[in-house]
Amino acid sequence: MSGAEKEVVVMTVPSTRRAFFGFAAGTIGALVATRVPVIAAPVQPASSARSFAQETLAGPFTLPLLDYATSALEPHIDQLTMEIHHGKHHQAYIDNLNKVVAEHPEIGELSVWEVLTDLTIVPEAVRPAVRNNLGGHVNHTIYWELMTPKSLEPSQALVDAITRDFGSIEQMQAAVNEAGLKRFGSGWAWVVSNSGTLSVTSTPNQDNPVMDGAGFPIIGIDVWEHAYYLKYQNKRADYLTAWWNLINWRTVDQLYSLAQEASATPTA
């Protein structure tokens, strides 16, 4: 690292449960509370998410539709990986989540975002299943919308925020890749926004950053082996490097804007 470069700190930013309930009350909760197929608009891929702000665990949840063909992300992510990852793995999280909700209808009135930010409100007997499967559904819904075969440039506001907090887009990417490589076993690497400040973190399994108060995710990369192993085998670093060729900056822009709106919303 040269003297002109800014040191990037991979960190978890503490936040209060009360602050994250501000997310639940605002538009930001929309992204994760999907119960119907989500077909993203070509100009604003995440815009359809706003309509789901009030969704609960009542279900049934269904698999979001992709806004591109399963072959469209090649050569960076192969078609078979996409078919299995989306159609099998994500579907399994949804099936398991629907089973839990059907067997425990008392949790149906809880909002998706409320549960993510405070899993203790879910009965202990089903908490692990909700954590893993709701987290898996939410994380993958974000992941699909963060990829596109035809990426555009990020907005100047987003570039300015990234430059302020990381030094450059390239330094941010390097920090995310490092977090993904250091995540032992299965998990995710994230860029999160917490009160307008961007940082990098990672989570195990299907945990979402809001579960531990790190912030609202604006970029998330799946580093489970099922996301890359057919093409990259044990070369997770190659997958992480290639993934940035697919990033949908329009989605990142919108998630960052939603995070900004939420942080500006009074939580009292």
Summary of predicted features, one role per range:
Residues 59-95:
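Mature N-terminal segment immediately following signal peptide/propeptide cleavage
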Residues 56-60, 76, 88-91, 99-109, ...:
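All-alpha RGS (Regulator of G-protein Signaling) helical domain and cognate RGS-like helical scaffolds
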Residues 5-31:
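N-terminal secretory signal peptides and thylakoid transit peptides that target proteins
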